[in-house]
């Protein structure tokens, strides 16, 4: 990654070659593309979009980078690790453009388009901690081949696979990657960032594509999205002192309803245990801490120490990630009020109704 960082203007080169890369993609039937030397590795079909994927824009960075590598190598299949290094480098270069702009414009957290991009690293020496951060980012957003300890099943993790945009082939230590038909279609949409804008991350067409073709693949996430939109649509803006509690309840009810149905198969038990039951345990523990805080409310230092002991529940993490991504897609408008609390409204009622049906 350090060597890739030394190479500057890679983002600009992708911009210059984008038309040729797209023309290369148009000639390929990705449904037919396979790496005959290796075995295809599939996404494990986890029915939620992981909270680790805070935004969707890095997926666009991934497919565009992949297209450029295909054009350069004149091959629809490229090395997986090489792709991850290149995609991270492009994401970091974009962050170097976005973050200074956002600081200059004093963008609030709710307005930042750089969320989900890696924090640029400027030191000459790469520390062990930085290497870990870089690898974690690449694994989460661009993909990682994993082996289930219980079943020994090999799967593909990461945002790109969760959205159904890529296919990966692996055997022993050799791993390659290509696009799916869906990944090709998503790549071919024009993107504001790759057109030179730094105050937008996804076009309306790209957002529509993700809403209509990607999110529905993850049934629990799709149900949460529909129920959350319904709640925000019915809430009078400014009338709710803190919408977070209401949104948490909607997320919890959506997940519980899906877990109780017969639609999740083997994942119902895991979602019940790791999301719902775990959230109940943490909430119970947090309430005990709240009681202790009341007992020492005049001791500011002790109050701060106790607050640090409180944990975020899995349901809260799902709510935060879901709302951030919906704001990115333009489905909800995210506003942070004077009290520092998040408020949400629906900018396009027809769009919201079409999703929440």
Regions flagged by a language model, labelled:
Residues 2-19:
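Charged, terminal alpha-helix-loop-beta segments
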Residues 15-357:
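Donor-sugar nucleotide-binding helix/loop cap in glycosyltransferases
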């Amino acid at each position: 990654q350090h060597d890739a960082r030394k190479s500057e203007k890679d983002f600009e080169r992708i911009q210059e070659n984008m038309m040729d890369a797209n023309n290369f993609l148009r000639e390929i039937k990705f449904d037919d593309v396979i790496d005959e030397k290796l075995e295809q590795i599939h996404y494990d079909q986890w029915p939620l979009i992981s909270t680790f994927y805070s935004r969707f824009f890095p997926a666009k960075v991934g497919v565009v980078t992949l297209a450029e590598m295909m054009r350069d190598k004149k091959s629809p299949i490229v090395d997986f690790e090489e792709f991850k290094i290149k995609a991270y480098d492009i994401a970091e270069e974009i962050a170097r453009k976005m973050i200074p702009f956002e600081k200059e414009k004093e963008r609030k957290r709710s307005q930042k388009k750089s969320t989900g991009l890696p924090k640029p690293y400027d030191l000459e020496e790469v520390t062990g901690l930085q290497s870990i951060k870089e690898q974690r980012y690449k694994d989460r957003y661009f993909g990682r081949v994993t082996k289930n300890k219980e079943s020994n099943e090999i799967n593909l993790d990461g945002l790109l696979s969760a959205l159904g945009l890529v296919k990966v082939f692996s055997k022993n230590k050799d791993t390659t990657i290509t696009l799916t038909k869906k990944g090709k279609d998503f790549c071919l949409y024009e993107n504001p960032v790759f057109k030179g804008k730094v105050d937008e991350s996804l076009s309306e067409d790209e957002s529509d594509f993700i809403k209509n073709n990607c999110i529905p693949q993850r049934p629990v996430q799709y149900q949460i999205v529909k129920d959350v939109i319904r709640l925000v649509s019915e809430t009078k803006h400014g009338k709710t002192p803190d919408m977070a509690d209401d949104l948490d309840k909607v997320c919890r009810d959506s997940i519980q309803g899906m877990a109780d149905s017969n639609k999740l198969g083997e994942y119902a038990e895991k979602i019940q245990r790791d999301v719902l039951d775990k959230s109940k345990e943490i909430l119970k523990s947090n309430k005990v801490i709240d009681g202790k805080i009341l007992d020492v409310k005049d001791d500011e230092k002790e109050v701060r120490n106790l607050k640090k002991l409180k944990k975020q529940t899995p349901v809260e993490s799902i709510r935060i990630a879901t709302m951030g991504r919906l704001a990115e897609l333009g489905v909800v408008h995210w506003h942070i009020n004077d009290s520092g609390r998040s408020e949400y409204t629906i900018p396009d009622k027809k769009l919201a109704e079409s999703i929440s049906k």
